[in-house]
Amino acid sequence: MSEKINLMDLTRQQMREFFKELGEKPFRADQLVKWIYHFGEDNFDNMTNINKKLREKLKQVAEIKAPEVAVEQRSSDGTIKWAMQVGDQQVETVYIPEADRATLCVSSQVGCALACTFCSTAQQGFNRNLTVSEIIGQVWRASKIIGNFGVTGIRPITNVVMMGMGEPLLNMANVVPAMEIMLDDFAYGLSKRRVTISTSGVVPALDKLPEMIDVALAISLHAPNDELRDEIVPINKKYNIKMLMDSVNRYLSVSNANHGKVTIEYVLLDHVNDGTEHAHQLADVLKNTPCKINLIPWNPFPEAPYAKSSNSRVDRFQKTLMEYGFTVTVRKTRGDDIDAACGQLAGDVIDRTKRTAQKKQFGQVIGVVNQ
């Protein structure tokens, strides 16, 4: 018997083709997508508006399978981090509630190949790309856990950011269909302004993105000059800052999802990239690119060669940029008591080691604390 097809690997259009091949009406795909994503259903028997004969046929050839939660950790600030089981490995998904929204940070790869020196995920190295079902399945599983707001009191997901483990633009074949499902009114129906793809600067893929999908864009810049960026974001050696910003401006010229602006992400590293001179250089780099700048206090991880910028250095950096007229925010660190903060996602390899050590110390698996 051939392997069953996971319907979570299919966009609604692909599912319509699947039903045609089964000799069924394409509208059945619309029904299935609604059942899977609107109602969180993964059991064909519970799909009451689909006749029993078709349900039995589907059970023979298809399945609905999302990653399972291996470990759940809840922060004192409401952030939840899940280690999701994907095959024999794990990736991490983070739920971040705020007063007016709730953002889900989703992984696109097991590990990451880009080797950014300040990021714990990069220290794990790259293992493989996630499939469509493993990406959209993170959203499905999180939505299932969060449940009904009226019952659980947990705010439903309003935004999805592809800012978890991995470089999304190195897995476009799976990331783009997953985002299509996020945007599909029959699935999650998120606005394209509420789905964000983040990249460290894979320029050829970024140039292709507008032909495939229109979503909000964030750029992990982190340095204002090529010499420094070559060191801390090594992909810059291949696609330098000018090449990247030219590509960003091309994307903005055709995108409707960004309000005409890109988000620039900038992790502040003490006495590395957080000086006033760096702020002036950054202002010069961004002067021709409509943007908002998100400054991110660095989140420490074991054996990292960096320190966190002081509040005074962060404030000075922000004020310098604001004097140029930029909109500049400082990201509030969320979930750092469970290593769910930006740059701390390391998945099974590192987390498992840390959890084991804590288990020996405290006799139970607890939220990971910064060392």
UniProtKB/Swiss-Prot annotation:
GO terms for cellular component: cytoplasm. It comes from the Bacteria. GO terms for biological process: rRNA base methylation; tRNA methylation. This is Dual-specificity RNA methyltransferase RlmN. Keywords: 4Fe-4S, Cytoplasm, Disulfide bond, Iron, Iron-sulfur, Metal-binding, Methyltransferase, rRNA processing, S-adenosyl-L-methionine, Transferase, tRNA processing. S-adenosyl-L-methionine binds at residues 166-167, 198, 220-222, 299. It is found in: Cytoplasm. The keyword Transcription does not apply. Reaction proceeds by a ping-pong mechanism involving intermediate methylation of a conserved cysteine residue. InterPro entries: Aldolase_TIM (IPR013785), Methyltransferase_A (IPR040072), RlmN_N (IPR048641), RNA_MTrfase_RlmN (IPR027492), rRNA_lsu_MTrfase_RlmN/Cfr (IPR004383), rSAM (IPR007197). It is an enzyme of class 2 (transferase). GO terms for molecular function: 4 iron, 4 sulfur cluster binding; metal ion binding; rRNA (adenine(2503)-C2-)-methyltransferase activity; rRNA binding; tRNA (adenine(37)-C2)-methyltransferase activity; tRNA binding. It comes from Actinobacillus succinogenes (strain ATCC 55618 / DSM 22257 / CCUG 43843 / 130Z).
